Amino acid sequence: MAQDAITAV
């Protein structure tokens, strides 16, 4: 997805 934020830290 283009609107994908980094949710994996």
From Swiss-Prot:
Heterodimer of an alpha and a beta chain. Contains one covalently linked phycocyanobilin chromophore. Its main location: membrane. It is found in: Cellular thylakoid membrane. Keywords: Antenna complex, Bile pigment, Chromophore, Electron transport, Membrane, Methylation, Photosynthesis, Phycobilisome, Thylakoid, Transport. Belongs to the phycobiliprotein family. One of its GO terms (biological process) is photosynthesis. GO terms for cellular component: phycobilisome; plasma membrane-derived thylakoid membrane. Light-harvesting photosynthetic bile pigment-protein from the phycobiliprotein complex. Allophycocyanin has a maximum absorption at approximately 650 to 653 nanometers. It is a peripheral membrane protein. This is Allophycocyanin beta chain. The gene is apcB.
